[in-house]
Curated annotation (Swiss-Prot):
Cofactor(s) needed for function: Fe(2+)
Annotated protein name in UniProt: 2-oxoglutarate-dependent dioxygenase iboH
Described function: 2-oxoglutarate-dependent dioxygenase; part of the gene cluster that mediates the biosynthesis of the psychoactive metabolites ibotenic acid and muscimol. The first committed step is glutamate hydroxylation by the 2-oxoglutarate-dependent dioxygenase iboH, and the last step is decarboxylation of ibotenic acid to muscimol by the decarboxylase iboD. The order of the intermediate reactions is somewhat ambiguous. IboA likely activates the carboxylic acid at position 5 to introduce an amide bond, and the flavin monooxygenase iboF generates the N-O bond.
MF annotations from Gene Ontology: dioxygenase activity; metal ion binding
InterPro entries hit by this protein: IPNS-like_FE2OG_OXY, IPNS-like_sf, Iron_ascorbate_oxido_reductase, Oxoglu/Fe-dep_dioxygenase_dom
Name of the encoding gene: iboH
Protein source organism: Amanita muscaria (strain Koide BX008)
Entry note: cofactor: Binds 1 Fe(2+) ion per subunit.
Length: 206
């Protein structure tokens, strides 16, 4: 265990516990709002006694990227819900309701978190819910000329949960995670050739 985590373990433990409670509560409320029952309720694919790839990530985007390229290429998140804490500019999203189809800045607000729907929840909902297509992008006008930091809690389904992916294939949550994670590591030019990176949302929002 890294010294920073070991020396601050109670802080990390409390943060993860609170993040998990918040995201699970949102899942339950979504299940209620969509009148889901029994095994179709979202929380029943996120049981705490089952293995999953749920994780906490500390993100750092150095200040000296090439402004001609995104700090993080357009993508949707792998899992169900993302609880994101980001006090600095840099996050953009493509709105499913905006006619211009242009990238919108997400204004950082003190005391607030950003919550994204990811691919797994989209698939578990039968694609009734939409994954958030977003990117991290530097700009000299709004983006602050400093290192950018954010904290993301990625709630993901239990690894054995099954759903239909973007191509209609039945896959496990673990398989979707593994295939998409490989795509994250590829050059942007190769990422753009696959619909895995965006979960097919770029075609829907085109």
């Amino acid at each position: 265990m890294p010294p920073t985590i070991r020396n601050n373990f109670p802080l990390f433990h409390d943060f993860v516990t609170a993040s998990h409670f918040i995201t699970q509560t949102i899942l339950m409320r979504l299940s209620d709002a969509m009148y889901l029952e029994g095994s179709t309720r979202f929380e029943n694919s996120h049981r705490e006694d089952k293995p999953s790839t749920t994780t906490l990530v500390l993100l750092h985007y150095p200040k000296n990227f090439d402004n001609a390229h995104s700090g993080h290429n357009k993508h949707t998140d792998i899992g169900s819900l993302t609880l994101l804490f980001t006090p600095q500019w840099g996050l953009q999203l493509l709105s499913p309701i905006q006619k211009s189809k242009s990238w919108l800045w997400v204004q950082p607000r003190p005391g607030h978190a950003v919550i994204n729907v990811g691919d797994s929840l989209r698939f578990l909902s039968g694609k009734r819910l939409k994954s958030c297509l977003h990117r991290v992008y530097p700009t000299g006008e709004v983006y602050q000329e400093e290192d950018r930091y954010s904290i993301a809690y990625f709630l993901r389904p239990e690894s054995a949960a099954n759903f239909e992916d973007v191509d209609g294939k039945v896959v496990s949550a673990k398989r979707w995670h593994d295939e998409k994670y490989v795509t994250y590591t590829e050059p942007h030019e190769k990422q753009d050739l696959s619909n895995i990176l965006t979960g097919g949302m770029d075609q829907i929002l085109a």
